[in-house]
């Protein structure tokens, strides 16, 4: 069974969101998603300064099995990306909720967080 931290919010497309304060949120893919994808070989991250809408594809995770679009779980401006993934994409596998995060976003509408799933609802969605 995948690890689903209770303090995070989740998109049905397998991204997680963690508040860092001041309207900034860290985003990554869930342990379940990285298990399905397998070993990461490349991660294409969005450009810092790019404005994205909730549900917009903004990154790509390429594994030995497939390439998968990563969607912005909330709208806002990309304020930072995880540069470590350029040389070490496997961090997405080894630490999906920590050093394997993808990017940080400054939310333009924090009300969108209410549309995301809590840990219980996300776990139920992947158990179906």
Curated annotation (Swiss-Prot):
Pfam families: GCV_H (PF01597). GO terms for cellular component: cytosol; glycine cleavage complex. Its cofactor is (R)-lipoate. Signal peptide: none annotated. The modification N6-lipoyllysine is found at residue 65. Binds 1 lipoyl cofactor covalently. CDD domains: GCS_H (cd06848). PROSITE patterns: BIOTINYL_LIPOYL, LIPOYL. The keyword Signal does not apply. Residues 24-106 form the Lipoyl-binding domain. Keywords: Lipoyl. The glycine cleavage system is composed of four proteins: P, T, L and H. Belongs to the GcvH family. NCBIfam families: gcvH, PRK01202.1. PANTHER family: GLYCINE CLEAVAGE SYSTEM H PROTEIN (PTHR11715), GLYCINE CLEAVAGE SYSTEM H PROTEIN-RELATED (PTHR11715:SF3). This is Glycine cleavage system H protein.
């Amino acid at each position: 069974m995948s690890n689903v931290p209770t303090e995070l919010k989740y998109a049905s497309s397998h991204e997680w969101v963690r508040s860092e304060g001041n309207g900034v949120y860290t985003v990554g893919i869930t342990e379940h998603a990285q298990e399905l994808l397998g070993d990461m070989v490349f991660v294409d991250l969005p450009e810092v300064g790019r404005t994205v809408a909730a549900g917009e594809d903004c990154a790509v995770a390429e594994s030995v099995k497939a390439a998968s679009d990563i969607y912005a779980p909330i709208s806002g401006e990309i304020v930072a990306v995880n540069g470590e993934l350029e040389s070490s994409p496997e961090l997405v596998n080894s630490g999906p909720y920590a050093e394997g995060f993808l990017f940080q976003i400054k939310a333009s509408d924090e009300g969108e967080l209410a549309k995301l799933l809590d840990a219980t609802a996300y776990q139920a969605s992947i158990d179906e």
